[in-house]
A protein has these predicted regions:
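Conserved catalytic or regulatory cores that recognize and/or transform ribose-phosphate-containing ligands
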Residues: 1-149
Length: 149
């Protein structure tokens, strides 16, 4: 059974961030999960016209509405990514947070933890989670149990 289309909310503004996005997409592809990544569709030049900015914004909002769930990569706290998570939460759709590199015992933001159905702290944890979800045919809710800030 399909988990539906996921919206991949993530920054990609450095080579390291870009690689992480590609790694996440590879995990989706391994599990035959359909995804939308703004990085692949709607790139905006720094000096883009107002109409181009509005077009890209509207396109991303359209895809948020069309997606069944959202994967939010919190690394480096990209502002656009956090906006997308808040918007998606208002749509009352499930959010899975991804924060590779969060050390054991580190605090995770309360607002994000409370709005998400899962927090994955590594690619292997994301892979395992999606394996279990695809096997069950549904996203599985596993509320974050670590320390919060």
């Amino acid at each position: 059974m399909s988990l539906g289309k996921v919206y991949l909310a993530s920054g990609w503004f450095s080579p390291e961030w870009m690689q992480e996005v590609e790694n996440i997409k590879s995990v989706f592809e391994k599990h035959n999960i359909s995804y939308f990544s703004p990085k692949d569709e709607n790139l905006c030049d720094a000096d883009a016209s107002d109409s181009m900015q509005d077009q890209i914004f509207a396109g991303n909002i359209k895809h948020l509405h069309e997606s069944e769930w959202l994967l939010c990569n919190t690394r480096n706290k990209d502002m656009g990514t956090i906006f997308e998570a808040g918007y998606f939460n208002c749509l009352e759709k499930p959010i899975v947070y991804f924060c590779d590199g969060l050390p054991p015992g580190a605090q995770f933001n309360l607002m994000l933890a409370a709005s998400g159905i899962k927090v994955c702290r590594s690619l292997s944890e994301l892979d395992d989670y999606l394996d279990r979800c695809t096997s069950s045919g549904n996203l599985i809710t596993e509320r974050y149990q670590g320390e919060i800030e």
